[in-house]
Curated annotation (Swiss-Prot):
This is Elongation factor G. It comes from Streptococcus pyogenes serotype M1. PROSITE patterns: G_TR_1, G_TR_2. GTP binds at residues 17-24, 81-85, 135-138. The lineage of its organism: Bacteria, Bacillati, Bacillota, Bacilli, Lactobacillales. The keyword GTP-binding applies.
Length: 692
């Protein structure tokens, strides 16, 4: 089958926002107007088309990014709906990795919210062009220009309106297009009858002022336009549109639109803006990768003529077809039934069927082309972030960074039958979600699961019960602490056992130094002259990794340590891998005596919104929880307090805040960084873990 839409007429976009900004409703409306659904599902009724897991429909939030294909104005638009809840950061990251552009949805009453900042920062890291849709203009307290101001103040974004609202709250009835200088008036609530009129007189002056600001802002990003602007020449609408497109694709400018997805206003104009201003796969730089055979950097331009290269960005278990691997094709063509090389794992994989997804219904297709997003059935070894390429033209594309989990729970199966099922269920869930870890406590034999937050683990335990029919008891949430060294030291690990027959002998000298935050464990072999034979070096590294998994103070994994093996000795007969592994772990224990070991705890960036009268309470809450205030701002009659607070102190805070503010206070928290715990807290943690 020939290609249906050219690359220039393809858009791969994500819809990203803070939880509750109306993102899923916006996506629903897009699907409605592009003819994919005939009846609109309301999120708060639990009937939304994109939220197809039972947990999502119950909680009214989007957890997994469903990928959908739609058509608008002769273009194919592939949409990935991303979750706005902080616990599902990895879902946002993996979708940003494969998108070419995004629509950031704001709640017009609140403007930029904490999770908007998180996803905006991630999108900036990945260089994703964005347009902004200020949604919920029909809501009480909606304020479009306030929302635009928060983009400047909180995100330092060069964002400017290309539309203005006519009316607000109940009176929101239309939109002014600042490029055409026309008013679009909605005459019914389905958003299908739109009248294009002249701008009402009372809005004309404001519209002219904002059009002038828009032209100036766009001209600043383009020399030719700047010259025309300074010389007082008129900039045509076509030049303005081209200027906005270029600056948006270069991530130098962010057009802001307005509307109400719930009331069906402004969604079609937003779709027009997706086509007009967001890039096609041809507008963005070719993806880079490394040839696994030569280690040389290679590019894969977006073209059907290039060798096939794709990135797997999501694994899902589907009740009907089993394991689905979602992938983005960067170059080349792929037919169902063919073989590809998973260069990340070095394994050959067969693509069974290829499906194009529409929320939770699907259509089987024979071929995918450069720029497409689809799902494959039949891949056995592929996980999130793996590269799939032509067997004759191998390349490893940049993978997806996975954040470390910060919270853990103990899970215990209720019966022997549940025990076996639980193992399988947890393994499948971990395959789908790289931020979900499953570990068995060596000493107690308990199963511990770790993730990004309470909601994250709640949803996974719930899925284990519903999808895999596993009954389990769940312990209280615990913080995932880490351990590290704060000083450099040298230590010897010497292991010798002679007791009849073959003995054991391993002897190493290792220098330990603190590593940069987030760099993890790094091992360096600095052995000269073979004092430790080459075949035993991997055993030394393995011995360190295994013993670091259980720490030196309280049994928590060690991070951010460099280890340099620089001396040692061996025995011709008695030395073995096991002996050197044990010697390495003894060196680590010895180093702990002088390397100032420390326990690290996750620090959360907490944003608390509360009535002004309760500001004193909130400041007291932060201080009492070992937190430090980072900033405050007033919004209406509320105060917004930003603070860094240890996760360990935040359990149960929702109840405290609710009772202090009579239910009017809310808070959001997102993991920010790890920090040393105070000495007194460290001693308590060590005591507790030793069962004293």
């Amino acid at each position: 089958m020939a290609r249906e839409f050219s690359l220039a007429k393809t858009r791969n976009i994500g819809i990203m926002a803070h939880v509750d900004a109306g993102k899923t409703t916006t996506t629903e409306r897009i699907l409605y107007y592009t003819g994919k659904i005939h009846k609109i599902g309301e999120t708060h009724e639990g009937a939304s088309q994109m939220d197809w897991m039972e947990q999502e429909q119950e909680r009214g939030i989007t957890i997994t990014s469903a990928a959908t294909t739609a058509q608008w104005d002769g273009h194919r638009v592939n949409i990935i709906d991303t979750p706005g809840h902080v616990d599902f950061t990895i879902e946002v990251q993996r979708s940003l990795r494969v998108l070419d552009g995004a629509v950031t949805v704001l709640d017009s009453q609140s403007g930029v919210e904490p999770q908007t900042e998180t996803v905006w920062r991630q999108a900036t890291e990945y260089g994703v062009p964005r347009i902004v849709f200020a949604n919920k203009m029909d809501k009480i307290g909606a304020d479009f220009l306030y929302s635009v101001q928060t983009l400047h103040d909180r995100l330092q974004a060069n964002a400017h309106p290309i539309q203005l609202p006519i009316g607000a709250e109940d009176d929101f009835r239309g939109i002014i297009d600042l490029i055409k200088m026309k008013a679009e008036i909605y005459t019914n609530d389905l958003g299908t009858d739109i009248l294009e009129e002249d701008i009402p007189e009372e809005y004309l002056e404001q519209a002219q002022e904002y059009r002038e600001k828009l032209i100036e802002a766009v001209a600043e990003t383009d020399e030719d336009l700047m010259m025309k602007y300074l010389e007082g020449e008129e900039i045509t609408n076509d030049e303005l549109i081209a200027g906005i497109r270029k600056a948006t694709i270069n991530v130098e400018f962010f057009p802001v639109l307005c509307g109400s997805a719930f009331k069906n206003k402004g969604v079609q104009l937003m779709l027009d803006a997706v086509i007009a201003y967001l890039p096609s796969p041809l507008d963005i730089p070719a993806i880079k990768g490394v040839n696994p055979d030569t280690d040389a950097e290679e590019e894969r331009p977006a073209s059907d003529e290039e060798p096939f290269a794709a990135l797997a960005f999501k694994i899902m278990t589907d009740p009907f077809v089993g394991r689905l691997t979602f992938f983005r094709v960067y170059s080349g063509v792929l037919n169902s039934g063919s073989y590809v090389m998973n260069t990340s794992k070095g394994k050959r994989e067969r693509i069974g069927r290829i499906l194009q997804m529409h929320a939770n219904s699907r259509q089987e297709i024979e071929t995918v082309y450069a720029g497409d997003i689809a799902a494959a059935v039949g891949l056995k070894d592929t996980t999130t972030g793996d590269s799939l390429t032509d067997e004759k033209a191998k390349v490893i594309l940049e993978s997806i960074e996975v954040p470390e989990p910060v919270i853990q729970l103990m899970v215990e199966p209720k019966s022997k039958a549940d025990q076996d099922k639980m193992g399988v269920a947890l393994q499948k869930l971990a395959e789908e979600d790289p931020t979900f870890r499953v570990e068995t406590n060596v000493e107690t034999g308990e199963t511990v699961i770790a993730g990004m937050g309470e909601l994250h683990l709640d949803v996974l335990v719930d899925r284990m019960k519903r999808e895999f029919k596993v009954e389990a008891n769940v312990g209280a949430p615990q913080v995932s602490y880490r351990e590290t060294f704060r000083a450099s030291t040298q230590a010897r690990g010497f292991f010798k056992r002679q007791s009849g027959g073959k003995g054991q002998f391993g002897d190493v000298w290792i220098e330990f130094t603190p590593n940069e935050e987030g760099k993890g464990f790094e091992f360096e072999n600095a052995i000269v002259g073979g004092v430790v034979p080459r075949e035993f070096i991997p055993a030394v590294e393995k011995g360190l990794i295994e013993s670091m998994a259980n720490g030196v103070l309280a049994g928590y994994p060690m991070v951010d340590v460099k280890a340099k093996l620089y001396d040692g000795s061996y025995h011709d007969v008695d030395s073995s891998e096991t002996a050197f592994k044990i010697a390495a772990s003894l060196a680590l224990k010895e180093a702990a005596k002088s390397a100032q070991p420390a326990i690290l705890e996750p620090m959360m960036l907490v944003t608390i919104t509360a009535p002004e009268d309760n500001l004193g309470d909130v400041m007291g809450h932060v201080t009492a929880r070992r937190g430090r205030v980072d900033g405050m701002e007033a919004h209406g009659n509320s105060q917004i307090v930003r603070a860094y607070v240890p996760l360990a102190e935040m359990f149960g805070y929702a109840t405290v805040l609710r009772s202090a503010t009579q239910g009017r206070g809310t808070f959001m928290m997102v993991f920010d960084h790890y920090e040393d715990v105070p000495k007194s807290v460290q001693e308590e943690i060590i005591k507790k873990n030793k069962g004293e």
